[in-house]
Amino acid sequence: MLRNNKTIIIKYFLNLINGAFLVLGLLFMGFGAWLLLDRNNFLTAFDENNHFIVPISQILIGMGSSTVLFCLLGYIGIHNEIRWLLIVYAVLITWTFAVQVVLSAFIITKKEEVQQLWHDKIDFVISEYGSKDKPEDITKWTILNALQKTLQCCGQHNYTDWIKNKNKENSGQVPCSCTKSTLRKWFCDEPLNATYLEGCENKISAWYNVNVLTLIGINFGLLTSEVFQVSLTVCFFKNIKNIIHAEM
């Protein structure tokens, strides 16, 4: 009786954690697909050659797909108490654990490289911004405008970065997104006291660092849950085995 009660309790917690993993797997797949397919967001627009976005997207989609698969297998194994499926389930969780460790290491080691890439790309976008010969870059200019308006900043270091832009009607102009203006055009003539003086670099770096730390924190939380899930699966497996032996 006690052994049966223990089995029910372990099964309940296994299904609970398994359901949470299923939702997370779907979220990983969705986020990975969004990064891969949406070319109108800040992350993809400044990574033209897909040095970072494609590998990260593929890892997220692969990890999400495998998570959904092992959750479905796990549900069948747990519900029907199929021992070989429980072994497969534990192995797949261990594999996902290893992939997440690699992903965390990749994010940490590439952090400075990603920041340098964005730094160089923003400099390039500033120099080409508003060019009549580059209509294909309008998406990048729009994203830069959204960044400057949302973060209330101007240029990479400050508003003087826009001096190097040669597409203005006069040298004193800055993008309308650098000001409190609501005009929908590339450049505006606004006084200095109506212009955002702080550069965007520090604000983007702060945003990026916070999100990287958040992502790593979530990842380590998942790793802990996976260790707990594997331990529960092993306990469940042993409990089923003991029940079978007791009934023989």
Swiss-Prot record:
The keyword Metal-binding does not apply. Disulfide bonds: none annotated. It is found in: Membrane. Keywords: Glycoprotein, Membrane, Transmembrane, Transmembrane helix. It comes from Homo sapiens (Human). Pfam families: Tetraspanin. This is Tetraspanin-19. Glycans are attached at residues 5, 158. The chain crosses the membrane at residues 16-36, 59-79, 87-107. Belongs to the tetraspanin (TM4SF) family. Its main location: membrane. The gene is TSPAN19. GO terms for cellular component: plasma membrane. It is a multi-pass membrane protein. It comes from the Eukaryota.
